[in-house]
Amino acid sequence: MASKLTTTSQHILENLGGPDNITSMTHCATRLRFQVKDQSIVDQQEIDSDPSVLGVVPQGSTGMQVVMGGSVANYYQEILKLDGMKHFADGEATESSSKKEYGGVRGKYSWIDYAFEFLSDTFRPILWALLGASLIITLLVLADTFGLQDFRAPMDEQPDTYVFLHSMWRSVFYFLPIMVGATAARKLGANEWIGAAIPAALLTPEFLALGSAGDTVTVFGLPMVLNDYSGQVFPPLIAAIGLYWVEKGLKKIIPEAVQMVFVPFFSLLIMIPATAFLLGPFGIGVGNGISNLLEAINNFSPFILSIVIPLLYPFLVPLGLHWPLNAIMIQNINTLGYDFIQGPMGAWNFACFGLVTGVFLLSIKERNKAMRQVSLGGMLAGLLGGISEPSLYGVLLRFKKTYFRLLPGCLAGGIVMGIFDIKAYAFVFTSLLTIPAMDPWLGYTIGIAVAFFVSMFLVLALDYRSNEERDEARAKVAADKQAEEDLKAEANATPAAPVAAAGAGAGAGAGAAAGAATAVAAKPKLAAGEVVDIVSPLEGKAIPLSEVPDPIFAAGKLGPGIAIQPTGNTVVAPADATVILVQKSGHAVALRLDSGVEILVHVGLDTVQLGGEGFTVHVERRQQVKAGDPLITFDADFIRSKDLPLITPVVVSNAAKFGEIEGIPADQANSSTTVIKVNGKNE
């Protein structure tokens, strides 16, 4: 039997349109990133239905991001093993796929969308090196805190051991322009190694020997202003754009037979001087200009920046618009020696981590395994790694009320950051492990603690879901729990139990207790080709589930089925069944039919807020019912008087156990009208 990893990987690939629809595939810390030929044939809803998938995010006209969380690398490697995908490697694409992926340069994307996409995809592959370097910095700052060394002392005053340790993180930032040049060129479809070689030329000992930063020297009879390009990001970005156009022009005029030799030759010959004379100084000027503007705002009032930054990040990160700020942080470290954005950014991160911690605690209380796994993964990735995407896509973007719990934490934490005027003296990812990199670290600790606990307590006090979402989640948990209990009962049942069940079903004199026991033990499974017809549990008009004015039901998140616009006022059992859940408020009931199909009947939308008023419940949990037995009676006029929709979803909650499930609309449905057909699964 295929593993869960393989099954999910196959599911993703199939619903992306298969290997023939994919032109390139990469991954970052949390997301699988695909470029596809035809985005219209991608079934986003079906991909998102897999429990292992945290979210699906379209990017531009050809990009698709599938959010997997911290195990993304495992899924990436598994997809590479599937038929038709073995030729893909991280970051590589065929020439034709590059043209498709980077068509945005020629007008398929708006320039703003493409600019942010360009920055995001340039920095994404470097994330691993930056994460590793940031933790090495943290260890050295801790050594400074305990008096073992002076983190900011010149290297010639450091012991040899610490000089070596400093080289381990400085290598990433010193040679960052080379990495940026490579990934930026790759994103644009230019040669990544030429993209790396251009900034590398400006970091060689020979170039540095020309003079100090700010000096002017004469090269080719022209004045050249020298700059320190170590740690710079804007010069290699701009140089990569120039390289794209130079390569494109050269390929038009150089015969294909000799392009491999002369395109890189002329590219280097043109782009290195162009970068040294013009593009490099211009890029440094752009970075300094943006940095100076933000510094002026910070100098005018740290409060403004400290509040705005954490309030903006929850909206920037889902769109990938936070990457430009990362570039500015690195620029600040290089030019000012410190950064004033990372501290306030920590307020957003820890408000986010506090929120998912609250979700984790609630999921433990409710025994909600699915949310416990999602929230635990997000919490650990955030607190230990400073990565917010698992929390963002696993919780925040799935439940709209979460932002009302998140933003107060961002605001409160941002205010504290403003009071202490937090600065970072190294580029790090804001996690518990990197607290010592902030100054004053105690003020920063107070700020992130405030952000964390404000959002966490708001979740614990007010929940993170709407009333409907909460009740449906609890209903599903209860149904799953009951299913586990029934499986145990089935496993412990004697071989004679199914026979007894058959006898009880056929004989008129079988007792109720025996019938209840054998109904649980039998728990039949539909064979391939077998069909169960489910009649309407109440009178009314049966309409497609997609027409329900609730995104959770309409998208089939709680299972496929049908919706009834009621004309009657009584919910009845559509078949012999066991009641597995009844809401105290009376607005919902879940049944396990003797066929093994589990259905949820939800009377109206947002009716939970009535607190049971207008509903009369006739059954209780674990009760055996016969077809036609009344389950719930409701006062339709009273519910309408509260301006609540009466449309009633009827969904199959254990759909994964069966094959195709079809909802059948009907103008006048009643207890003899088939509204759902459930087919046995083909093994």
From Swiss-Prot:
Keyword Membrane in record: yes
GO MF annotation, one: protein-N(PI)-phosphohistidine-sugar phosphotransferase activity
One GO cellular component term noted in the UniProt record for this chain: plasma membrane
Transmembrane intervals: 126-146, 162-182, 193-213, 225-245, 260-280, 303-323, 344-364, 376-396, 409-429, 442-462
Keyword Heme: no
Domain PTS EIIA type-1: 550-654
PROSITE patterns: PTS_EIIA_TYPE_1, PTS_EIIA_TYPE_1_HIS, PTS_EIIB_TYPE_1, PTS_EIIB_TYPE_1_CYS, PTS_EIIC_TYPE_1
Keywords of the record: Cell membrane, Kinase, Membrane, Phosphotransferase system, Sugar transport, Transferase, Transmembrane, Transmembrane helix, Transport
Membrane topology type: Multi-pass membrane protein
Domain PTS EIIC type-1: from-to ranges: 117-476
Protein location: Cell membrane
Bridged cysteine pairs (disulfide): none
GO BP, one annotated term: phosphoenolpyruvate-dependent sugar phosphotransferase system
Short name of one Pfam family: PTS_EIIA_1
Domain PTS EIIB type-1: 1-89
Main localization of the protein described in the UniProt heading: membrane
Enzyme class: transferase
Enzyme Commission numbers on file: 2.7.1.191
Domain of life: Bacteria
Annotated catalytic residues: 28, 602
Catalytic reaction equation(s): D-mannose(out) + N(pros)-phospho-L-histidyl-[protein] = D-mannose 6-phosphate(in) + L-histidyl-[protein]
Free-text note regarding domains: The EIIB domain is phosphorylated by phospho-EIIA on a cysteinyl or histidyl residue, depending on the transported sugar. Then, it transfers the phosphoryl group to the sugar substrate concomitantly with the sugar uptake processed by the EIIC domain. The EIIC domain forms the PTS system translocation channel and contains the specific substrate-binding site.
Biological role stated in the UniProt entry: The phosphoenolpyruvate-dependent sugar phosphotransferase system (sugar PTS), a major carbohydrate active -transport system, catalyzes the phosphorylation of incoming sugar substrates concomitantly with their translocation across the cell membrane. This system is involved in mannose transport.
Protein name: PTS system mannose-specific EIIBCA component
Organism of origin: Corynebacterium glutamicum (strain ATCC 13032 / DSM 20300 / JCM 1318 / BCRC 11384 / CCUG 27702 / LMG 3730 / NBRC 12168 / NCIMB 10025 / NRRL B-2784 / 534)
Gene that this polypeptide is encoded by: ptsM
